[in-house]
């Protein structure tokens, strides 16, 4: 029995060595034909963690789970008309430029407002803009920009406005069944590899349509076929909720709207999380407003009655005054923003955070020691 077991082990080892040699030969041939790195073991990759870029909204970064939009991936932003889709995308453009990157905007709808984009923080002098004549032209331009490797973000607004050239050349009323879907399917096949290789973020804004004859379930769908749904790593559903009333002289006016952004698909973090943001008309997402709400919910900003305070110092009575204080003190805004991101695990702890935590622990130990000394003194007095 022992001899049989030993023989079996020798045969297994022999076949194992032969398979390993065959694999090594195959890898060498692949590397020779297609270049180094064509096939590699996953653990050999220099960067295994997904790189992200902030969306420009703290609440959305938290909902995305990874801290922002993943680099080298396709993002789809869709929703009803005037829900804030382009606003969300423009904040990503502004954030890209803020981090020193280059952004491009493919305006297929021919409706980009430069003044509004500038109000959101976009440097319109540095923004690459294209207003294509057809869907093929717009996607071809996007592809060339991505292939260059010099562009960090490409926004296409919108998929529904990418009209195939055959439809433009034809007459109104002509049937072009599946033409746009085939165009998008081909574009996704060509662009996906280049997007991943160059680590470019590609954001596609999309509209909503309704399926005809749907009695049960959700009749809503997005145009352009199913290819974009499959290739997108993140899909965001943007919906406007309640209107926001102004204060003071504007108390009877609508100055913005509360918007819900739902992550309906996420390949880099758990999906189905929601972000609630305030989109102010003419200003975009209120970054101070979302910071005050989130920081007060987790206790970084303390709230007592109508007063908000930070580190024992009052920063405003009412949320509007607290938002104004943070807007006037960008260094305090950045400090609180960093603490919130650390709390949700979106950024790694730095030395200052570690020192601060250590000081808090030391204080707690000292307080406990004082209490123990007082208890011992009280006991001695009672015994005497």
UniProtKB/Swiss-Prot annotation:
Disulfide bonds: none
Binding site for ATP: 79-86
GO cellular component, one term: cytosol
Origin: domain of life: Bacteria
Subcellular location: Cytoplasm
Pfam families linked to this entry: RecA (PF00154), RecA_C (PF21096)
Gene Ontology MF terms in the entry: ATP binding; ATP hydrolysis activity; ATP-dependent DNA damage sensor activity; damaged DNA binding; single-stranded DNA binding
GO biological process: DNA recombination; DNA repair; SOS response
Keyword set, alphabetical order: ATP-binding, Cytoplasm, DNA damage, DNA recombination, DNA repair, DNA-binding, Nucleotide-binding, SOS response
Role: Can catalyze the hydrolysis of ATP in the presence of single-stranded DNA, the ATP-dependent uptake of single-stranded DNA by duplex DNA, and the ATP-dependent hybridization of homologous single-stranded DNAs. It interacts with LexA causing its activation and leading to its autocatalytic cleavage.
Family named by the database record: Belongs to the RecA family.
Entry protein name: Protein RecA
Organism: Streptococcus thermophilus (strain ATCC BAA-250 / LMG 18311)
